[in-house]
């Protein structure tokens, strides 16, 4: 407890975990590993996904066009049936992200990409300086956020080492996470050519460690604890009063921003909760899934007739 403050213990009949994919996984792995919640499914951390993403950017030489002005994402397109690309802008002053950029390289092998990096650097040493120049970076840069709806995933598990307890991830050998998406590099090069800028990748490219803005999964729905972490009503298997309601319950690479899917799943899960004092319409765990109609609240937060009124059908 920080600053010597007294520890407080809170009790609740129902507990919702909604800390975001990474932190929810971290908390639950801690609880399982320390035997506080030992019956959490062994599948915890499996089917974690990165939305099969690539982050590339085109950096212009000046701020004749201020790319920081406007909505963060204004459009998108699909270069093929599985790939979705969005031009993204950062607000003025958001320049720290630029330090993760580096000289753009191509290839499915990290060794090959490192060779390309050195070759490009020796051919034009000033290229690295221009890539790492983060002055007014957000005003000079267009990010190409690339996402794919392919079936790739990683497993996130706890590990103890000299550095203590931490989480580590491994690629699935049969469904490996994408480390190189050619369309992403092609698009950002075209943006750079159009505006006289420099295309850039990120430092993870050099070690086959893709970055993602949308880490999801790891606490997925299953028919039992042998196939998933939660049931179809978002109750943790073997702990039916513990609920997970965030991005960690997403079960696939969506290929788009997952925020609306996370919201839809959360709304569905909580719409099936009973009103206080009423009988729970959800079946007891292990009795199988059944379709349930949403439960109308007795005392809705938004009054009847007001804008944003909840309608249950």
What residue ranges belong to the model's regions?
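Short, glycine/acidic-rich hinge or "gate" loops at secondary-structure transitions
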Residues: 198-206, 279-288
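FAD cofactor-binding and catalytic pocket of flavoenzymes
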Residues: 41-166, 215, 237, 247, ...
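Active-site lining segments that contact anionic ligands and/or coordinate catalytic metals
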Residues: 7, 12, 70-72, 139-143, ...
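Hydrophobic alpha-helical scaffolding
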Residues: 17-18, 132, 174-178, 256
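Short helix/loop capping segments that flank catalytic or ligand/cofactor-binding pockets
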Residues: 25-27, 67, 155-156, 229-231, ...
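Generic recognition of flexible, low-complexity loop/linker segments
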Residues: 4-6, 44, 130-134, 142-143, ...
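Glycine-rich loop(s) and the adjacent beta-strand/alpha-helix scaffold that form part
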Residues: 1-77, 246, 259-287
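A glycine-rich dinucleotide-binding beta-alpha-beta segment and adjacent secondary-structure elements
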Residues: 145, 168-252, 259
């Amino acid at each position: 407890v920080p600053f010597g403050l007294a520890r407080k213990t809170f009790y609740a009949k129902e507990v919702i975990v909604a800390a975001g994919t990474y932190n929810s996984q971290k908390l639950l792995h801690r609880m399982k590993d320390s035997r506080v919640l030992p019956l959490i499914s062994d599948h915890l951390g499996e089917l974690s996904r990165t939305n099969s993403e690539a982050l590339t950017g085109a950096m212009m030489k000046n701020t004749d066009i201020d790319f920081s002005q406007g909505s963060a994402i204004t459009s998108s397109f699909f270069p093929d049936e599985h790939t979705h690309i969005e031009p993204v802008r950062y607000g003025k002053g958001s320049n720290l992200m630029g330090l993760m950029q580096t000289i753009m390289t191509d290839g499915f092998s990290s060794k090959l990409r490192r060779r390309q990096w050195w070759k490009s650097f020796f051919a034009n040493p000033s290229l690295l300086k221009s890539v790492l120049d983060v002055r007014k970076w957000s005003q000079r840069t267009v990010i190409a956020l690339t996402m794919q709806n392919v079936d790739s995933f990683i497993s996130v598990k706890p590990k103890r080492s000299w550095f203590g307890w931490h989480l580590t991830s491994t690629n699935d050998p049969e469904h490996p996470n994408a480390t190189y998406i050619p369309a992403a590099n092609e698009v950002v090069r075209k943006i750079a050519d159009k505006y006289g800028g420099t295309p850039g990748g990120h430092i993870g490219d050099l070690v086959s460690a893709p970055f993602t803005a949308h880490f999801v999964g790891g606490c997925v729905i299953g028919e039992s604890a042998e196939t998933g972490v939660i049931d179809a009503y978002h109750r943790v298997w073997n702990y039916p009063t513990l609920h997970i309601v965030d991005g960690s319950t997403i079960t696939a690479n969506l290929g788009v921003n997952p925020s609306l899917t996370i919201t839809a799943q959360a709304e569905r899960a909580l719409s099936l909760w009973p009103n206080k004092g009423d009988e729970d319409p959800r079946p007891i765990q292990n009795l199988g899934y059944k379709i349930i109609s949403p439960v109308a609240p007795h005392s809705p937060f938004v009054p009847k007739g007001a804008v944003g009124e909840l309608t249950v059908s």
